[in-house]
């Protein structure tokens, strides 16, 4: 029996969970037959936890104890308050993930412990790690994080879009990504990606909200901008108007008894035309077109070389988007797969592939950033101590492992400082510093002592960095995700317990690597020795390496149970390579 690995689209506005079964992906429904879970969390009047539609419904009356669009804050140090308690964005996202997990378990009739989760292609390492942490807090082993446009392209590939170059235009509630994807011979390859992780349908809503506030101020002399409950009702009306204007030229916005001023009620009655609305959001659409051109340039393509345009994300239902894309590319964009569901469907396809199901595509993902370090060099023709030296260029296929050599600058130099940056600017200080460490105790040697800097980027965008003195083997290494992480292991455990307490007692989920009875341990001599060697490395391995060790051991055990000799041989070779890497 193939292991169930669910696919999750953890969205800014809505989230979905899907599974690959019966040779196709399907989005799972809750007990009321709903496929879409609003990404909203709240606490009811009696202190009960609300997730999804119930939380969204109370947002109008109780905005102070309801949280939405938490995805915008993923990877930040922000804290949010809910019912007198303080939570991180990871914890709020974990509540949503835990609800999705429950929906899947009820639908499938079996425990769900592993998931593929999607993120915007332009999410930073910090945001990707925060997503992984949210999954761990929710009791899920996140076996893969993939880009949302990649997942969507995979769904369309299943519809036999072979041998084409495709633009995936992904505009969700809070993020935008333009990805150029090549589909050929059953392989989905992301050539380039560019976007903005703070641009989406929420911005469209806020433009309508601003219009409504101005209308009330000018026509009725009332300012409700400092009244949370009134603002929540206005936001809900703005969202409804936006959706209505996708299919109609006008939207009527009405809210009775919105507020009271000097004892008199204020009623909102306003008609908004599509033309007015499109004028409000046109600058945002132009931003997305500019991002598309950056992605095209990175892929060394012109607009005429694009064969298909695929629309992803609920905000793409806005007619202006289709019109501007048609003007720019002289072709119609396609959106026949529900743009709200296709990302979750693609995640489920990837989950099925990882679990061993036969699917038609192999994902080749790329990094949306350049990763590098700083060194003495030149900038604009002048000596500069912080010249940016790229090591992993933007749009490199991942996973990737690259090294470069640097040299000490003084005789008997004892220490080197390594700074790791993310960005494209030739001035390292203009890029984002994502980690730093020192290598101390270098051997006494003349200037020019070689230091090898090694960067390994995995499929989840998590970076492992090491610096080694070539002549002695002296080495220091860091994992950037932990350097930027908002949690250490104890905090992860505490956060998971807090979320578990909110949900109440459930079946005891096993965290990855924990004991769960019969393990099906390999008994074949060479394989058993290899597995034992891997298990001995678990304590000293960094978290990402430890997770990969656990994954490969599990795959080996599963292949032995199923007598899958081909799969066993592949996993054995991968584990051998990983152990070799860890020992060098």
Regions from the language model: what does each represent?
Residues 1-76, 80-86, 95, 102-584:
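Oxyanion-binding/catalytic loops of NTP- or PPi-dependent enzymes
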